[in-house]
Amino acid sequence: MITIYTSKGIKHKVQSVIKTHGTNNVYEICDIQKIYILKNDLGQANGLLQHDKATDQYLIHINENLQHQQFVIAHELGHYFLHKRLNTFKVVNCSKVLKDKLEHQASLFASELILTDKMLNEALPYIQGFSKEQIAAYFNVPSFVTDYKLSQIGSFSNRIYSHEISAFG
């Protein structure tokens, strides 16, 4: 069975991962999960999650030439925590739509993991008035991560910290 997560479901999954592991640091999470990170020249690919059935070991391969390797590792962790029971290579007639949905979910997971709401709230005094690009640079994340996070914050009109939302507008 394929589980299609909502954005809210992904956020809750990330919060659970952070609580369980005591960190949002992708390297520490990989260490705790015994997931090895291998850096190689992957050509056009940014990264991939591999499972070795013989040893029941997971590996994350990342392209050594990438600027935002942390995001790619977080993306692959998204596949691990959201989709590890689903092997799209074995799903008969796996459509491009399904593949795109799974990739989108992994990217949302990565965005929530490397730029948490708590991080944004704590940095508010420093980043107030910053553009999305400046916020991305402040946290050293790709700009699409801040685009996603700020759109999510803006969508919660009944949020407790409503005064903080206006600062991200």
From Swiss-Prot:
It comes from the Bacteria. InterPro entries: IrrE_HExxH. Its EC number is 3.4.-.-. Gene3D superfamilies: 1.10.10.2910. One of its GO terms (biological process) is proteolysis. The active site is at E76. The keyword Repeat does not apply. One of its GO terms (molecular function) is metal ion binding. It is an enzyme of class 3 (hydrolase). Involved in the regulation of horizontal gene transfer through the integrative and conjugative element ICEBs1. Required for degradation of the ICEBs1 repressor protein ImmR/YdcN. This is Metallopeptidase ImmA. It comes from Bacillus subtilis (strain 168). The gene is immA.
